[in-house]
């Protein structure tokens, strides 16, 4: 499935007509050079588009409204080359509805000591103009990203590129539709949530369908289509019979192939990009969707188990934000399962009954069929693997009753000490920063869930920027975290974000 459009970002330079035509011509030339070099740098995942210099109220207002209605525009980058009176920007900023990045830079790298005169000073006064603009945006209470430094610097360019992915998340959030083919697991609290408020805040549409309606789509898949997908499975993955009859094993795998095709066709037909299931509500399905869901996640669909629509939407969001990323390491739903508490080897074994995305796999991926005590169905086929090493983030969007909070924990993924031959599920193993004891205490104090949307490919800053853009509280747990300061942050968050 598609995980995003070919978005573009507009580059809008601010100035005024006080300095004359020659100055404005240089402003436009310099802006074009910056845009050209940014696009050539290879550090930005999306194209930057130059726009004529903004010097009047009406031009600013018209440009921002054109950005609002342009489906390909995911955000605007603004920079004040000269001084630009900020009252000129008020109407445009009031009506603007997309992500905004304020680039605080300067065309020239160095002061030309021998030749500098007042013409140069008037032409190159970003230090002046950007402060004026920044004051107005702050006074208006508009959420934006500020990036500061030489425009030719690789670090600055990568910061812009990083923000672009956050901006895509903000824009695409309102296009996420989650299909619930099961309600929440009975008596579970943290997977509940206000779906109306989620649509108001994030733009998510969360709808329920009877499980047997999607089961009809599964039953309608032809035998030939099913067999063709099974052949793909057998050519792509290791087959671990573990003493089972090969023909019987293949039948179990075929059930998952039929579910994958039926689910995907139903999701495409109804225009949904994420799905939730629950082992307690399987209707006419012969197996709990396992391998099928894993494959759908790998294609870009979001997923949440036991009715967890918040995780499903967040996984989909992260899939969009990381789409097209070079050397991406993967994104998946995960669940905190069990601890290793041995000193110096502390960590959390992450898994689920079946449904972990193979995009995070490291090494061989195998198909197993094993009994599942929950669901009262056939032994489901699933993909089994271990996950990559490296730093990632585990996020948990929780409903606190009067508002949402996004927990963002930076985690260090590792290999387990020994194989786990009797564990028939995909796994990840990580140590939360700053350490297991502090990280777990902080997570519990902040109200985090046991399900997470995890990725190797985004940073805590990116997801925190997304949360702030959506008007919700981000809570960071990382190497800088202390419980004393976290408690203060949570108390402040309760004051600032409470309705």
How should each PLM-predicted stretch be described?
Residues 45, 104, 109-244:
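Cap/lid and interdomain-hinge subdomains that line or gate substrate/regulatory clefts
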Residues 25-41:
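Short catalytic helix/loop segments, enriched in acidic residues and glycine
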Residues 231-232, 236-324:
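Long, internal scaffold/assembly segments composed of regular secondary structure
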Residues 300-425:
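C-terminal catalytic subdomain
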Residues 376-499:
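Extended hydrophobic packing segments that form well-structured cores
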Residues 73-83, 101-103, 272-277:
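Periplasmic-binding protein-like
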Residues 3-26, 175-184:
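Short beta-strand segments enriched in small/hydrophobic residues
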Residues 60-73, 90-92, 260-269:
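Short, well-structured alpha-helical segments in soluble
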């Amino acid at each position: 499935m598609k995980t995003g459009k070919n978005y573009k970002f507009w580059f809008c330079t601010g100035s005024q007509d006080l300095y004359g035509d020659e100055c404005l011509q240089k402003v436009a030339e310099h802006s074009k050079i910056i845009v050209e070099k940014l696009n050539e740098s290879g550090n930005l995942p999306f194209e930057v588009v130059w726009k004529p210099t903004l010097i009047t109220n009406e031009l600013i207002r018209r440009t921002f409204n054109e950005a609002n209605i342009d489906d390909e525009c995911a955000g605007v980058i603004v920079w004040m080359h000269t001084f630009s009176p900020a009252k000129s920007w008020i109407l445009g900023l009031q009506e603007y509805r997309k992500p905004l990045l304020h680039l605080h830079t300067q065309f020239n790298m160095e002061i030309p000591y021998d030749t500098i005169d007042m013409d140069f000073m008037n032409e190159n006064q970003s230090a002046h103009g950007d402060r004026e603009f920044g004051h107005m945006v702050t006074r208006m209470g508009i959420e934006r990203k500020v990036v500061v430094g030489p425009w030719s610097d690789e670090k600055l360019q990568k910061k812009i590129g990083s923000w672009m992915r956050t901006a895509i998340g903000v824009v695409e959030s309102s296009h996420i539709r989650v299909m619930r083919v099961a309600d929440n697991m009975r008596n579970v609290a943290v997977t509940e949530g206000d779906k109306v408020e989620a649509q108001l805040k994030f733009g998510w549409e969360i709808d329920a369908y009877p499980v047997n309606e999607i089961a009809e789509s599964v039953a309608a898949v032809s035998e030939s289509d099913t067999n063709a997908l099974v052949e793909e499975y057998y050519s792509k993955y290791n087959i671990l019979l573990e003493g089972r009859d090969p023909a019987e094993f293949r039948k179990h795998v075929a059930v998952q192939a039929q579910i994958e095709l039926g689910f995907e066709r139903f999701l495409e037909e109804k225009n949904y990009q994420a799905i939730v299931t629950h082992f307690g509500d399987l209707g006419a399905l012969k197996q709990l969707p396992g391998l099928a869901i894993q494959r759908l996640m790998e294609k870009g669909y979001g997923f949440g188990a036991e009715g967890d629509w918040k995780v499903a939407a967040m996984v989909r969001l992260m899939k969009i934000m990381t789409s097209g990323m070079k050397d991406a390491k993967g994104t998946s739903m995960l669940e905190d399962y069990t601890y290793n508490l041995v000193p110096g080897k502390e960590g959390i074994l992450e898994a689920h009954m079946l449904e972990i995305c193979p995009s995070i796999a490291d090494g061989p991926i195998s198909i197993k069929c094993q009994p599942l005590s929950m669901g009262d169905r056939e032994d489901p086929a699933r993909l089994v693997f271990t996950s990559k090493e490296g730093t990632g983030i585990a996020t948990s969007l929780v409903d606190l009753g009067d508002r949402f909070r996004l927990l963002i924990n930076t985690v260090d993924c590792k290999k387990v000490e020994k194989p786990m031959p009797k564990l028939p599920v995909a796994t990840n193993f990580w140590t939360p920063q700053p350490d297991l004891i502090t990280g777990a205490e902080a997570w519990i104090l902040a109200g985090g869930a046991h399900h997470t949307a995890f990725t190797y490919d985004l940073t805590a800053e990116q997801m925190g920027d997304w949360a702030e853009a959506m008007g919700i509280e981000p809570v960071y747990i990382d190497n800088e975290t202390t419980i004393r300061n976290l408690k203060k942050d949570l108390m402040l968050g309760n004051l600032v974000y409470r309705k």
